[in-house]
């Protein structure tokens, strides 16, 4: 798989090349939300294009990360490390996080 930063750059450049938004961050979040909805609809209706819809979600997320100057690959790896260290358990019949998993805990 290509480097995350390169994918971010490509997603952003595609927006620029097509004259799409690269400055209105709230709009980008709304568009991302819409793509998540489309992916859910594809899944719930058992459509064969659910993978393509999930790719759209990823592309919007990569573009937004580039707009916000966030190294998404680094952040995903960091967050996955935190999630691995978290401990969960059932409290009153509901799964809950028992330990945060943050460094130093």
PLM regions with names:
Residues 1-105:
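Flexible "arm" and connector segments at domain edges
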């Amino acid at each position: 798989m290509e480097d995350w930063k390169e994918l971010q750059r490509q997603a952003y450049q595609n927006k620029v090349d097509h004259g799409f938004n690269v400055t209105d961050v709230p709009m980008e979040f709304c568009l991302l939300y819409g793509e998540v909805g489309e992916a859910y609809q594809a899944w719930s209706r058992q459509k064969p294009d659910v993978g393509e819809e999930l790719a759209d979600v990823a592309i919007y997320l990569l573009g937004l990360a580039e707009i916000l100057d966030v190294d998404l690959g680094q952040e995903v790896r960091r967050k996955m490390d935190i999630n691995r260290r978290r401990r969960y358990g059932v409290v009153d019949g509901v799964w809950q996080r028992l330990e945060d998993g943050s460094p130093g805990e």
